[in-house]
Amino acid sequence: MGKVLKTVEAITAKTKIAIACQGGGSQTAFTAGALKALCEARIADEFEIVSMSGTSGGAVCAVLVWHALERGDHQPWRQLMDFWQDNSAKGWAEIAFNQLLVESVRMINSGLLPTFQLSPASAVSQSLMQFATMGLRENFTSFQTLLEKHVDFAEIASWGPRAKRPILMVGAANVTTGMLTKFISNREPIRVEHVLASCAVPTIFPAVLIGEDAFWDGLFSDNPPVQELIRPSSVGAENVPEEIWLIKINPTRRETVPVRIDDIIDRRNQLEGNISLFQQLRHVEMLNDMQLSHAFRPEFLGQFDIKAPVRIPKSFSGSPNKPYHIPCIEMSPELAETLDYESKIDRSAEHIEHLIIEGEQCARAFLRERALTVAAEPLVATSS
């Protein structure tokens, strides 16, 4: 009878997944669209979201959905959509400011305008920004104000460290120690400073001080955290995922060699954004391959409820196929080719809306492709 019950439980158990959201400024409106589509598809009926991670704009999207899920919202994507609508330029003044900023940076990166290197923490930079943004909404000019409007950090603080699923993980880089830092919801309440730290691009925002430490953008950390999602010491032994769903912003492949300086800057940023991701995926691949080779004792795997290798996406399309590979959610090559570095700071409503729609479409395609892939490559349990 006991064996029968265990068999029924195994059949009806939901697949445990972790969702990792890469950073990329305004381009992470794509991530927002993808998360919206996943929620609308009612993935919770079939899957158990055990953890979410993100850096920079990916962290913002992850925090918004996580907060809504923790509050029991039946439509967790609405909080996400409200944020991005508020983050878009509204009215002629904001539209003009956004266009001037984007085009100025584009001309500087193209070598058509001189650049003046000013620290974002300097009094001159802050005075210039205050002058340039006079009359604009505070939600548009103050990132902290925008975050605090859409996420109740006081409520999160009242929860304390939260062991409840999903576990939230926000990546940032410690400027002075060089350590890759993860702010994890089961260890401490997620604060607005944690999200600001993950988004602190050093040429745009001053380093974020938390206690005696200063932090920069998650691009210099794990973009996004992936390895930590499978570590029991980070997420809890019961929250090790069976699959990691990656929402990727930076394209892996480019068809032509960049020659113009603005194209070089764009491609360099993409490569920098993917370095840590690929390193982490290769590490998980190595562990998966060892598991398939029976390098781990069944009783060791049983401690963490690990029944098979963790399904993850491939780093490169030309790499050999492995039975644990699944697709990732990423932009179509056609869209990626139309985006440049400056599109990561573009907050025009049309740009944001286009990326959200693309994210929705790609997430729906991912669900279809993933189902076919998993059906074609069932993983045999490696522990008893």
Question: PLM features: what roles do these ranges have?
Answer:
Residues 1-53, 60-384:
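Patatin-like phospholipase
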